[in-house]
UniProtKB/Swiss-Prot annotation:
One protein family per Pfam: DAHP_synth_1
Annotated protein name in UniProt: 2-dehydro-3-deoxyphosphooctonate aldolase
Superkingdom of the organism of origin: Bacteria
GO cellular component terms, semicolon-separated: cytoplasm
EC number assigned by the record: 2.5.1.55
Record keywords, A-Z: Cytoplasm, Lipopolysaccharide biosynthesis, Transferase
InterPro entries xref list: Aldolase_TIM, DAHP1/KDSA, KDO8P_synthase
One GO MF term: 3-deoxy-8-phosphooctulonate synthase activity
Catalysis performed (reactions): D-arabinose 5-phosphate + phosphoenolpyruvate + H2O = 3-deoxy-alpha-D-manno-2-octulosonate-8-phosphate + phosphate
Pathway: Carbohydrate biosynthesis; 3-deoxy-D-manno-octulosonate biosynthesis; 3-deoxy-D-manno-octulosonate from D-ribulose 5-phosphate: step 2/3; Bacterial outer membrane biogenesis; lipopolysaccharide biosynthesis
Organism: Acaryochloris marina (strain MBIC 11017)
Length: 278
């Protein structure tokens, strides 16, 4: 059975409810982070979706040197711990350097490896050594079958709890495209798959000093992923995306999230009751 046990009360994979990894791209203020986590959690509870709060304490791969990056690791982890304690949900956040793995694992239930860094062996091994669930985003430059090598590295490091995320493939300059064959291909490695609906509509560097995006297409891609078969969805969400300091053009407005998720859930339920064609 393809399933990853993230916490005592959360499993992702076969026989489990759809899971949503969601939150603002980067930690902004402490109050705003808690507000967003609470708002998304209420929607997920209403719809019967498992929820993991996502936000990055540091966006180390911003397009411009002048772009907002977030907070020092210690401050970001303190805020994420408040989300866990006060909202009562697991959290996922990125690590960019090997030395971050152990301290981040003390708070985060899932360590996320950014797409640009998915082949960095030392980073993968450090994450594997923590024993936490690891969500690896497939690089925009990788074929889905090449993620088998990433999985092999993690397994060699002792990782047993792995998630693999599709987030689009480079399609010329400043553009991404999704090859949905990647979902069953990566799932064949024996681990649950996640579809990142909002980064898949990103236009990397498309605004010169920042990335653009086409958030209006994210719901369509998410429905397609649900139709093919996916264990979790990744969606960045913001109260006011047009004012967000990072990835605003991609993010789903909070007030639209419930309406975005409802048809995705219907498709997911149908596919869960439909045999997969050989």
């Amino acid at each position: 059975m393809i399933r990853t046990q993230v916490t005592d009360t959360l499993a992702i994979g076969e026989g489990c409810p759809l899971t949503l990894l969601s939150g603002p791209c980067v930690i902004e203020s402490e109050d705003f982070t808690l507000k967003m986590a609470s708002g998304i959690a209420r929607i997920c509870e209403k719809l019967g979706i498992s929820y993991v709060f996502k936000s990055s304490f540091d966006k180390a791969n911003r397009t411009s040197i002048s772009s907002f990056r977030g907070h020092p690791m210690e401050e970001g982890l303190r805020i994420l711990q408040r989300v866990k304690d006060e909202v009562g949900v697991p959290v996922v956040t990125d690590i960019h350097e090997s030395h971050q793995a152990a301290p981040v694992a003390e708070v985060a239930d899932i360590l996320q490896i950014p797409a640009f860094l998915c082949r960095q062996t030392d980073l993968l091994m450090a994450a594997a050594a923590t024993g936490r669930t690891i969500n690896v985003k497939k690089g925009q430059f990788l074929a889905p079958w090449d993620m088998k090598n990433v999985v092999s590295k993690l397994e060699a490091g002792g990782a047993k709890k792995i998630l693999l995320t599709e987030r689009g493939t480079s399609f010329g300059y400043n553009a991404l495209v999704v090859d949905f064959r990647s979902l069953p291909q990566m799932r064949s490695f024996g681990y649950p798959v996640v579809f990142d609906a909002t980064h898949s509509v990103q236009m990397p560097g498309g605004q010169g000093s920042s990335s653009g995006g086409q958030r209006e297409y994210a719901p369509y891609l998410a429905r397609a992923a649900a139709a093919i078969g996916v264990d979790a969805l990744f969606m960045e969400v913001h109260e006011n995306p047009d004012q967000a300091p990072s990835d605003g053009p991609n993010m789903i407005p909070l007030h639209q999230l419930e309406d975005v998720l409802r048809p995705i859930l219907e498709v997911h339920k149908i596919m869960n009751s439909t045999p997969v064609l050989a």
